[in-house]
């Protein structure tokens, strides 16, 4: 036989050429065909001609004879998404289980319970010698779990208290973090110099690095604890704002000291570069966040025709700001916070109400799941072999964290109180110092330490875990009874009324004017300047014009315009002194409304007057608001009954000689036995069947309000006497249908020309005293009569003249 190579290829050209052409026609498989055909040449070995069955398409394996399996298991194919789904499901079920027993979350914070669940799972994983899931890496924490929590906190942060206390928050976050980092680091370095403790190999820079990461007040732990105790808004915004900005400062100091530890020699230029980097990282993150927030607002200006993607822009631009800042080694926390606060101001006015609800609840869901996973992963990662115990280092670390935190708060507050209008009390300072909870930030940072540079990394991990567990468990559990014992001012859950908001804005303008007159540039002055700049430039650029108004506002506007035109026609709007002769007073006529106009008015009122108002309540972090339709319906029912009682009471106390300018009667409700149009009658029957109406039919039939415009005070005396006799008071006693005793029933009301009934022009009211009514209520047979019912009738235009004429002596 000839050797493999040219001779063999010349011997059998037709099948190979046909196969090559066939595979090349098939597309990308041509390259694979050439590789398979040239493989024997490259190896220099003899081989038999390739059969079509031996050529394998890309992405498949060689043909093997096998049978079709009935059941297969391929866990590695879905391992990562399957485990992530199970972790999220476990975290959600754990939260449901905690809240089944209502007293448990009030005694023990939810974060403590989740850490305990994580410790239990970590012990199980460690016992079966399994590795931790891939989701527990520190990169996953900083890139996927932390951004939703910071986004939720920044988007729904109360902006006015934050900016009013911005100086104090920055004072605590920047100066306080430097105070704690340097104080803890230097103190631990002094402890390490004692040879008896065996810590002499830890340098000053390593202690400063550990002090910077252990001084990070975690916003996740602070939110989990302080939202349950409901402290006042100022105290909450100080602690939360400090924890939010404190993390950004901590990360900058951490990277700075970490770079110094990796350098062999540190020069003076490196120190100044580190200080400059401190400001560049913070300010750069804020600028990136504001810029992308403006872009998000400008984008949502053009989404009125496609509302579905509006919530998507909020999450995309906010997360883009975070990862962009991290890409340039800037502060991602500052970037996403600034972006969220900017979007909350402008994006909310461009998106629809449904999109806003979607944003709110989806953001709440993401933050809640991320927070739950963080605490569970902290418990799981605690159990392992990466620990080194040293009593001196661990105990002194915990003591120095508490001491330097308390000293920093009291010293810095004493300085900042000189510049505050409302100084912080001793109780507030104590709660701020007590609320310095450590959490996932320092836990993740200590795991990021390179083991080659830090040989005592396991000791740092152990000390950080002890500090985290002490602050979360001991301080977190005892802070609620401590707040109650000190009687710290709590938050007011009452929603601000419209009048209160108007008065607050009025006082803001007054204080701004006073500051302008005095030449003092306070926060009121700068807020007013920014508002003018915002109205003049930013809102015109970022907010869509011709914002749609709600139906109730449009209806109210139409009714007000119609009422103003009517008042102008009747002359009631004139309040300036008149120089016309008082004797020359003529009765003004009002154009009667056509039946079609009356039907239209009644239809508008019946459709829109008593609709339940839909309100968006204030944001609560983890608890969904209950359905308020029943409560709003009860509120409307109470207000309607109260207004009806007040109107009857006021009309009873009116002067009998009230003047009337016209004889036209306008009814708020229809007179008794008046037939409705078919459209309104069907709607009324449907509403009564559904139970929407809260007033009984009997009351609606007997209670008729006569709405007549008030006349001028200079009407002639004869006309006022004539109008004052339009009402009379008398009894109307109603007895049971079965008894034939009692007073005779009143005569039937005469029919009008239109076919409806006219109510008599008599106002029936009880005139007897309480004792006399009790005596008359007994009949001859001893059966008590039913109490008289108050019936109020209004006069009809057709019967007024005849009744007034019959009453004359």
Curated annotation (Swiss-Prot):
Keywords: Antiport, Cell membrane, Glycoprotein, Ion transport, Membrane, Sodium, Sodium transport, Transmembrane, Transmembrane helix, Transport
Keyword Transmembrane: yes
GO molecular function (one): sodium:proton antiporter activity
A GO BP annotation: proton transmembrane transport
Residue spans of biased composition, Basic and acidic residues class: 648-660, 793-809
Membrane-crossing residue ranges in chain numbering: 107-127, 138-158, 169-189, 209-229, 237-257, 278-298, 308-328, 361-381, 392-412, 430-450, 459-479
GO annotation, cellular component aspect: apical plasma membrane; brush border membrane
Tissue: High levels in intestine and kidney. Strongly expressed in gastric epithelial cells, with particularly high expression levels in mucous cells.
Membrane topology label: Multi-pass membrane protein
Localization per record: Apical cell membrane
Annotated glycosylation sites: 350
Alphabetized Gene3D superfamilies for the sequence: 6.10.140.1330, 6.10.250.1040, 6.10.250.2020
Start and end residues of each stretch annotated as Disordered: 648-700, 734-809
Catalytic reaction list: Na(+)(in) + H(+)(out) = Na(+)(out) + H(+)(in)
InterPro entries: Cation/H_exchanger_CPA1 (IPR018422), Cation/H_exchanger_TM (IPR006153), NaH_exchanger (IPR004709), NHE-2/4 (IPR001953), NHE_CaM-bd (IPR032103)
Family under the similarity heading: Belongs to the monovalent cation:proton antiporter 1 (CPA1) transporter (TC 2.A.36) family.
PANTHER family named among the record's database cross-references: SODIUM/HYDROGEN EXCHANGER, SODIUM_HYDROGEN EXCHANGER 2
Record function comment: Plasma membrane Na(+)/H(+) antiporter. Mediates the electroneutral exchange of intracellular H(+) ions for extracellular Na(+). Major apical Na(+)/H(+) exchanger in the base of the colonic crypt. Controls in the colonic crypt intracellular pH (pHi) to direct colonic epithelial cell differentiation into the absorptive enterocyte lineage at the expense of the secretory lineage.
Quaternary structure note: Interacts with CHP1 and CHP2.
Name this polypeptide is given: Sodium/hydrogen exchanger 2
Organism: Oryctolagus cuniculus
């Amino acid at each position: 036989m000839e050797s493999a190579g040219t001779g063999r290829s010349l011997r059998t050209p037709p099948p190979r050429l046909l196969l090559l052409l066939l595979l090349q026609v098939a597309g990308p498989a041509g390259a694979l065909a050439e590789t398979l055909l040239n493989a024997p040449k490259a190896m220099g070995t003899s081989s038999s001609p390739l059969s079509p069955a031996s050529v394998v398409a890309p992405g498949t394996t060689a043909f093997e004879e096998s049978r079709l399996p009935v059941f297969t298991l391929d866990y590695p194919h879905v391992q990562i998404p399957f485990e992530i789904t199970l972790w999220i499901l476990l975290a959600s079920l754990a939260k449901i289980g905690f809240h089944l027993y209502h007293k448990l979350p009030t005694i023990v914070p939810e974060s403590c319970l989740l850490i305990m669940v994580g410790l239990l799972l970590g012990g199980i994983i460690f016992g079966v010698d399994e590795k931790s899931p891939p989701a527990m890496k520190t990169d996953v924490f900083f890139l996927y779990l932390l951004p939703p929590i910071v986004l939720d906190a920044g988007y729904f942060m109360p902006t006015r208290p934050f900016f009013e206390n911005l100086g104090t928050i920055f004072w605590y976050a920047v100066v306080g973090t430097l105070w704690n980092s340097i104080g803890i680091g230097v103190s631990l370095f002094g402890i390490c110099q004692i040879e008896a403790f065996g810590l002499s190999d830890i340098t000053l820079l390593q202690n400063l690095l550990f002090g910077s990461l252990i001084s990070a007040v975690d916003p996740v732990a602070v939110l989990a604890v302080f939202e349950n105790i409901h402290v006042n808004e100022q105290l909450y915004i100080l602690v939360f704002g400090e924890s939010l900005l404190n993390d950004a400062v901590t990360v900058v100091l951490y990277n700075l000291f970490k770079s110094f530890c990796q350098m062999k020699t540190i020069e003076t230029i490196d120190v100044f570069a580190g200080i400059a980097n401190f400001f560049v990282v913070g300010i750069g993150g804020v600028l990136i966040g504001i810029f992308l927030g403006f872009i998000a607002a400008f984008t949502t200006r053009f989404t009125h025709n496609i509302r579905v993607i509006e919530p998507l822009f909020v999450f995309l631009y906010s997360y883009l700001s975070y990862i962009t800042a991290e890409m340039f080694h800037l502060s991602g926390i500052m970037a996403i916070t600034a972006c969220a606060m900017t979007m909350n101001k402008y994006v909310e006015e461009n998106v629809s109400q449904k999109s806003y609800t979607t944003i709110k609840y989806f953001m709440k869901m993401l933050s809640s799941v991320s927070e739950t996973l963080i605490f569970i992963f902290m418990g799981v990662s605690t159990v392992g072999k990466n620990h080194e115990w040293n009593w001196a280092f661990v105990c002194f670390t915990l003591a120095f964290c508490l001491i330097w935190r308390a000293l920093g708060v009291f010293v810095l507050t004493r300085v900042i109180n000189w510049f505050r209008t409302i100084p912080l009390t001793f109780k507030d300072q104590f709660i701020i110092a007590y609320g310095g909870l450590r959490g996932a930030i320092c836990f993740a940072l200590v795991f990021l330490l390179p083991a080659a540079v830090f040989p005592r990394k396991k000791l740092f991990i152990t000390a950080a875990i002890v500090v985290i567990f002490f602050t979360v468990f001991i301080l977190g559990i005892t802070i609620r009874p401590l707040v109650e014992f000190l009687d710290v001012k709590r938050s007011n859950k009452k929603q601000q009324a419209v009048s209160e908001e108007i008065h607050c804005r009025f006082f803001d303008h007054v204080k701004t004017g006073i500051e302008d007159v005095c030449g003092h540039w306070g926060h009121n002055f700068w807020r007013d300047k920014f508002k003018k700049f915002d109205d003049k430039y930013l809102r015109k650029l970022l907010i869509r014009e011709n914002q749609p108004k709600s139906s109730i506002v449009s209806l109210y506007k139409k009714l007000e315009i119609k009422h103003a035109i009517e008042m102008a026609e009747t002359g009631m709007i004139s309040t300036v002194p008149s120089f016309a002769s008082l004797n020359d007073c003529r009765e003004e006529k009002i154009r009667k409304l056509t039946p079609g106009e009356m039907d239209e008015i009644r239809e508008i009122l019946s459709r829109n007057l008593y609709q339940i108002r839909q309100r968006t309540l204030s944001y609560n972090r983890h608890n969904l608001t209950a359905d308020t339709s029943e409560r709003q319906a009860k509120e409307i029912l109470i207000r309607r009954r109260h207004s009806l009682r007040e109107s009857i009471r006021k009309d009873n106390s009116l002067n009998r000689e009230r003047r009337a300018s016209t004889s036209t009667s306008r009814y708020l409700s229809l007179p008794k036995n008046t037939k409705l149009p078919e459209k309104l009658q069907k709607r009324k029957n449907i509403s009564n069947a559904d139970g929407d109406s809260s007033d009984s039919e009997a009351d609606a039939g007997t209670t008729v309000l006569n709405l007549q415009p008030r006349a001028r005070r200079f009407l002639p005396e004869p006309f006022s006497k004539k109008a004052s006799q339009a009402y009379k008071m008398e009894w109307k006693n109603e007895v049971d249908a079965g008894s034939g005793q009692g007073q005779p029933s009143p005569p039937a009301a005469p029919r009008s020309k239109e076919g409806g009934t006219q109510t008599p022009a008599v106002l029936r009211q009880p005139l007897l005293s309480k004792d006399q009514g009790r005596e008359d209520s007994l009949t001859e047979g001893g059966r008590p009569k039913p109490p008289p019912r108050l019936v109020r009738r209004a006069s009809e235009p057709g019967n007024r003249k005849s009744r007034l004429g019959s009453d004359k002596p």
